């Protein structure tokens, strides 16, 4: 019996993200070397709920600390093995994300990347109004769809994104096992004061 290697799903998604950030001008400010990509397991694959999320590792305007009710707080830091600090974490919720059709997977990936602040400062892109993370959902979705279409028209290599065509069962049949990086959600913690 020959053992098949597992398929590293988070590394594959990170490669798609890198290609999108290279090809789409509106995403070129993103340095994927400073964006961690992980997965979180969902209880089921129902097409309801969250498919992915972007977690900023800084507060508003890229600040490392915030003051709430007279106390200073910071976020837990996350580093690459070479010591470079991550500024964002992209989480993909599996198997829920995997069960989406290709078009929705691409929309979801670009949707999350577009949350990254244009100054790449660890904060989210902010819009005017109460819904600072999206502004108008209709307008946000229109922008995302346009960026996905731009990426597809740029003819990205099939070997980078073809795995997104598969659902969970197809991936298991093709690769035998899925693997990926699990990253604990960072906590807001009291800041050390000198």
Where are these regions (language model features)?
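Short pre-active-site segment immediately N-terminal to the catalytic Zn-binding motif
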Residues: 91-108
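Active-site recognition of the HExxH zinc-binding catalytic motif
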Residues: 105-119
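Metalloprotease/metallohydrolase-associated module, dominated by Zn2+-dependent proteases
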Residues: 1-91, 119-194
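Generic "edge-of-domain/loop-turn" microfeature
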Residues: 44, 97-99, 115
């Amino acid at each position: 019996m020959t053992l098949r290697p597992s398929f590293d799903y988070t590394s594959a998604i990170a490669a798609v993200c890198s290609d999108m950030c290279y090809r789409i001008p509106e995403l070129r400010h993103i340095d994927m070397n400073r964006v961690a990509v992980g997965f979180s397991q969902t209880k089921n694959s129902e097409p309801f709920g969250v498919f992915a999320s972007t977690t900023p590792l800084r507060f508003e305007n890229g600040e490392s600390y915030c003051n709430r009710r007279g106390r200073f707080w910071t976020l837990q830091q996350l580093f690459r093995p070479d010591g470079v600090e991550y500024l964002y974490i992209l989480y993909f919720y599996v198997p829920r994300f995997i069960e989406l059709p290709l078009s929705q997977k691409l929309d979801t990936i670009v949707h999350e990347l577009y949350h990254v602040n244009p100054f790449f400062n660890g904060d989210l892109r902010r819009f005017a109004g109460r819904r600072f993370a999206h502004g108008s959902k209709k307008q946000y979705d229109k922008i995302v769809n346009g960026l996905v279409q731009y990426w597809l028209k740029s003819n990205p290599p099939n070997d980078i994104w073809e795995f997104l065509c598969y659902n969970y069962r197809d991936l298991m049949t093709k690769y035998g096992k899925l693997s990926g990086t699990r990253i604990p959600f960072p906590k807001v913690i009291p800041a050390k004061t000198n």
